[in-house]
Design a protein with these regions (language model features):
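Feature captures hydrophobic
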Residues: 1-128
Length: 128
């Protein structure tokens, strides 16, 4: 099935701009951050198809998606939920932040037996 969503070149460019801003201590461009978040979300959905875990990146530039094999959740609050902010999500996906360290620092809130993305991180950025 062909991937839909963010163009790979646009996604890579946005990720690079966001990481460069973070590294320089500059304000991160919100448009680039939104593209980077959605790009990584799409890549994670491809890498771990399914509906067992709900990943939430709240806010106007955030998103929510389901991934991971296992029981599908259909009503109410999902039993396996991960929530983090957009910058932490990009840093995790890019390999700039360790999963367990982010959870320990409270940058990621994960609940449920399947709420662990560590085996999927970092996310490789595909070529065009």
């Amino acid at each position: 099935m062909p991937r839909q969503g963010i163009d790979p070149a646009q996604g890579r460019s946005a990720v690079q701009r966001v990481l460069a801003s973070i590294d320089a201590g500059d304000t991160v461009d919100r448009a680039a951050l939104g593209i980077a978040v959605r790009h990584f979300a799409g890549l994670l959905r491809e890498r771990a198809p399914g509906h067992s875990v709900e990943v939430r990146i709240p806010g106007p530039i955030g998103t929510a998606f389901q991934c991971g094999e296992g029981p599908q959740h259909t009503r109410g609050t999902p039993p396996n939920t991960i929530e983090t902010d957009p910058i932490t999500f990009v840093r995790l996906c890019a390999g700039r932040t360790d999963w367990s360290a982010a959870v320990a620092a409270g940058e990621v809130r994960a609940s449920g037996a399947r709420a662990d993305l560590s085996a999927l991180l970092p996310v490789d950025l595909p070529e065009d």
